[in-house]
Amino acid sequence: MCQLLGMNCNTPTDIVFSFEGFRRRAGLTDSHSDGFGIAFFEGKGVRIFRDNQAGHSSPIADCVKQYHIKSFNVIAHIRKATQGEVTIENTHPFIREIWGENWVFAHNGNLTSFPDMSESFCQPIGSTDSEAAFCYMAEQLKNRFRKKPTEEQIFQVIQEITKELTQGGTFNFILSNGEWMIAHCSTNLHYITRKAPFGTAQRIDDDGVIDFRQHTTEKDKVTIITTFPLTKDEIWTKMEHGGFVFFKDGDKVYEVLGTPKETIDDGTLGNAKAA
């Protein structure tokens, strides 16, 4: 299946350190090489880069590395296709308008059954289960609320819609409107919140090292969400199966617990450590 990466923080931050480890899993330390994408929220807009080439060798991914774009919310995805051809339109993250806002979504999993959206107002452009599920989510939200509801209401309804969709299979996802970020875990999803006092970190996939003290202030809070941990010397929290977390400004605001289960390594961590 695919892998996810998200960042939510209280100050504009670049995601290059995490992204560089993450993209190595797109064909070097792991086999998620059927395309990559990354979306940066900038005010009300979204700067999105996608390629159907493997993320580790994509010139577009190289551009992202060199650009050092800073954002409050970022979502990235590396694809290992289960449904749909390896094309740009099937590459995550996906974006839709909801209540006059850009919403961005990326999914890891496989839905063997999902709603038919062929006659809906919000229709998929590609042929993935992921985009169809996002379109269903967007349409359900708009049907239930004519105007934008509270964040707590959004979080509650996302849970209800997700429970419908998970009946069709595995549905890990990260979702953001540029103000907050919601993560749901079906199998594997981990997060870490970095805040003062900051220290150093070493990547699992290539031993890259960073000293966060050189790039932060005492007020900064940065939460990273990913399928599997990206660093070897930090403590990551594994989300519970069926759990939801709502992040804003780098803080965990709401959480719904699921069933605690240990990380099931699909080969990613073993391959990364051996690389």
Regions found by a protein language model. Give the residues of each.
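Extreme N-terminus nucleophile/cap motif
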Residues: 1-59, 74, 201, 242-244, ...
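Conserved beta-strand-loop-short alpha-helix elements that form
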Residues: 2, 103-113, 247
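Cytosolic regulatory regions built on CNB/CRP/Popeye-like sensor folds
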Residues: 43-47, 101-102, 113-122
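Short acidic (Asp/Glu) patches
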Residues: 52-64, 78-101, 117-120
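Glycine-rich phosphate-binding loop plus the immediately following alpha-helix
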Residues: 113-115, 119-144
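Gly/Ser/Thr-rich active-site loops/lids in small-molecule metabolic enzymes
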Residues: 126-129, 187-210
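Catalytic core of PPM/PP2C metal-dependent serine/threonine phosphatase domains
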Residues: 147-187
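A conserved acidic, glycine/proline-rich C-terminal tail/linker
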Residues: 200-244
